[in-house]
């Protein structure tokens, strides 16, 4: 009985991944892979295949810990939270994709126009950060993978 209680307590205190990441809800300088986001806040989830979820998680934690610009705040189960430069980065690893949320700590003014090629109004710094992270880990946005399969 005592062993069962100790096990229950240990499981209750073990780090838990959230079921999902919170939405940007119109915040400036925030992107998310939540499909309900407005287009200027949406970025496709990242696929980590052919890696397993455990390997993808280990690689991501290692990369973020080794990056001098990042401080890992939480790495529970399949969830990672880090402060990278001026952004809070959250990664939630599902079976075959990584969902994410990247939000600036200090919100800036989002201009109502773009001056860069392929710009989507707002949150370009956060888009570049998550795409660079994915590239370094060998992950790709699921929409680019799907488009490549159709070509």
Predicted features along the sequence, with ranges:
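Generic alpha-helix initiation/capping and coil-helix boundary signal
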Residues: 3-5, 119
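N-terminal chloroplast transit peptides
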Residues: 1, 8-12
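Ser/Thr-rich, low-complexity intrinsically disordered terminal regions
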Residues: 13-151
């Amino acid at each position: 009985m005592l062993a069962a209680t100790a096990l229950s307590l240990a499981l209750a205190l073990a780090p838990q991944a959230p079921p999902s990441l919170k939405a940007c809800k119109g915040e400036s300088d925030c992107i998310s892979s939540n499909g309900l986001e407005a287009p200027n806040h949406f970025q496709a989830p990242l696929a980590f295949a052919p890696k397993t979820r455990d390997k993808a998680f280990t690689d991501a934690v290692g990369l973020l810990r080794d990056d001098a610009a990042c401080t890992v705040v939480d790495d529970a189960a399949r969830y990672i939270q880090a402060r990278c430069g001026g952004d809070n980065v959250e990664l939630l690893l599902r079976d075959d994709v990584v969902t994410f949320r990247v939000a600036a700590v200090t919100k800036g003014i989002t201009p109502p126009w773009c001056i860069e090629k392929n710009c989507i109004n707002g949150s370009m710094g956060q888009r570049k950060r998550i795409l660079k992270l994915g590239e370094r880990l060998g992950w790709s946005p699921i929409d680019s993978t799907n488009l490549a399969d159709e070509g």
